[in-house]
Design a protein with these regions (language model features):
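Short amphipathic alpha-helices and their capping loops
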Residues: 1-9
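Acyl-thioester-dependent acyl-group transfer interface
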Residues: 9-23, 44-195
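A short glycine-centered flexible hinge/capping loop motif at secondary-structure junctions
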Residues: 28-29
Length: 195
């Protein structure tokens, strides 16, 4: 069923992490690579019906920069990379889609490339020509840039990671759920967390 304008649906799934790791490792993939590939595979099979497409399926994936730059900051410290699959032939297996996703992510998730992305982002913030521009104009410009970048990607998948809590709180918590706000042009999104 189609939802009314201005509303969105949320679907939650829960699975044992140990079993997911076993399946992902069976494909020689990390959990992130596996989830992104499953999402791309689903779009390829269900929306494109396994046919070649003119546009790539592009998934925005946030990358935590802390391990690459030895940082303990509690602020958001990440950049976005885009895992890309471009269906050009009649039929792909899941393994072929996964290999494309892994290649795409591996080519971008390395210290040199992440440093370039981070430096570009910081240079925009420190641009002396932008300092006298009123904040409301900067906010409008940022909204336009954000919307254009969101439309450039089919969807976004983020992995919050393993959520740890103090032992004294564990009896009161059954699990965690998370979701990402909707973006123009991205009507499906995924959030992963483990507990």
């Amino acid at each position: 069923d189609k939802l009314p304008a201005g509303e969105f649906g949320v679907m939650h799934g829960r699975m044992p992490v140990s079993q997911l790791k076993k399946v992902a490792h069976g494909y020689h993939a990390s959990l992130n690579e596996y989830f992104v590939a499953v999402f791309v595979w689903s779009v390829y099979k269900e929306l494109l019906h396994g046919m070649p497409g003119g546009k790539p399926i592009r998934i925005a994936v946030p990358v935590n920069l802390r391990p690459y730059f030895d940082s303990d900051t509690t602020k958001n410290f990440f950049v976005m990379v885009s895992a890309e699959f471009r269906p050009q032939k009649e039929s792909y297996t899941f393994e072929e889609v996964l290999a494309c996703i892994q290649s795409s992510l591996h080519s971008q998730i390395n210290k040199e490339h992440l440093e370039d992305l981070f430096s570009y982002s910081v240079s925009n913030q420190r641009n002396l020509l932008m300092r006298p521009v009123p904040l409301f104009l900067k906010n409008i410009a940022m909204r336009i840039v954000y919307e254009k970048s969101a439309v450039a990607n089919t969807t976004t998948i983020t992995n919050i990671g393993n959520i740890k809590i103090k032992d004294i709180y564990q009896p009161y918590i059954e699990g965690f759920s998370a979701f990402i706000a909707m973006s123009k042009g991205q009507y499906l999104k995924g959030t992963i967390c483990s507990y």
